[in-house]
Amino acid sequence: MSQVIFSVDRGGAEPGAEMDDEMTLNMGPHHPSTHGVLRFVISTDGEIIRKAVPDVGYLHRSIEKIGERCTYSGFMPYTDRVDYIAAMFANEAWASACEKLMGIEVPKRAQYLRVISCELNRIGSHMIALGAMAMDVGAVTPFPWALREREYINDFIEELCGARLTFNYHRIGGVSFDMPKGWADKVKHWLDRFEPIMVEFDRLISLNDIFIKRLANVAVVTAEEAKDWGLVGPNLRGSGVKWDLRKEDAYSVYPELEFDVPVGRGRYGTVGDCWDRFYVRVEECRESAKILRQALDKIDEHPEDDILGKLPKKMRPDGEAYARIESARGDMGCYVIGRGAEEAYRARFRTGSFTAMAMIEAKSPGLFLADLVALIASFDVVAPEIDR
């Protein structure tokens, strides 16, 4: 959760001088150790926002240019920094683009391990988003609840690959490690307790009258607006658009798994409001739990340690490829061009947070200042996805 810090710019007016009704507020930036480095320059008329202009770039580290200076395999650890809240997805996007470029086939067991690791990461990312959003509008208890479940997930992923935040788990052609003995049973046992906890989470916050009043009918994004502005993931589905790359592109082993695609329905307000965007993520956690159960059962149909495909002796591809996956924040695409060298000629990421930030700016005018934090939290932007 970002700590909200305001500084007031009164345009250099002397104390007691007559002023117009507009006030400029600087919201942020925040320290890099918090959940994102964001700054908004906000103009207000009393408590009503006239405009909120995002100032991006505080976490820019030229990661795409770094991708053009590393070998194809050597760039994998850097992809963890594209979205450090859910790092598995950028791992998979880069690996998938390189595999497409080089014609590498990934073993089925490795594909299942990718799905399992990514769906765990999706739940962990949504737990942060849901807990932080509740905290931002004044509900304290849900945040430690959400962090507790994320800690269980971090423990599982640490057992799987040795890291808790930046994983470097996926490899071009597969994954780095098979799951340890007994690991699948631990995850299933956790799922047995996680699903009832999500029911309690609904009772505690999702269906809480005060919480609903803070979010329902706030910052409504229609389906047409969402598509026109290029929103993806839960932000697009929150506007009632049923679009999920796990279904539409049917990549990896997702066609073998059964799950639903939750969308906003305007249950307590209008389709596409802040509550819909919140609750789509709640329902996605339940769907990810379904996917995990199926994947953990089906993975045993494939031989152990068959986790890395046949790689070319030299990774010096010539051509270009684009691969996209459904990350926790939506469509994450990776475009790579090879020119026969050990390094990519061009590496490019397409992420969901950049367009979400543009929509935050568009939807801010007319809101109360107190609702801006809810709007930002409902889009679940993460700074390094914007600053690439």
UniProtKB/Swiss-Prot annotation:
GO terms for molecular function: NAD binding; NADH:ubiquinone reductase (non-electrogenic) activity; quinone binding. InterPro entries: NADH_Q_OxRdtase_suD (IPR001135), NDH1_su_D/H (IPR022885), NiFe-Hase_large (IPR029014). It comes from the Bacteria. It catalyses: a quinone + NADH + 5 H(+)(in) = a quinol + NAD(+) + 4 H(+)(out). GO terms for cellular component: plasma membrane. It is an enzyme of class 7 (translocase). Keywords: Cell inner membrane, Cell membrane, Membrane, NAD, Quinone, Translocase, Transport, Ubiquinone. Its main location: membrane. It is a peripheral membrane protein. Pfam families: Complex1_49kDa. Its EC number is 7.1.1.-. It is found in: Cell inner membrane. NCBIfam families: PRK06075.1 (NF004739). NDH-1 shuttles electrons from NADH, via FMN and iron-sulfur (Fe-S) centers, to quinones in the respiratory chain. The immediate electron acceptor for the enzyme in this species is believed to be ubiquinone. Couples the redox reaction to proton translocation (for every two electrons transferred, four hydrogen ions are translocated across the cytoplasmic membrane), and thus conserves the redox energy in a proton gradient. NDH-1 is composed of 14 different subunits. Subunits NuoB, C, D, E, F, and G constitute the peripheral sector of the complex. Belongs to the complex I 49 kDa subunit family. This is NADH-quinone oxidoreductase subunit D 2.
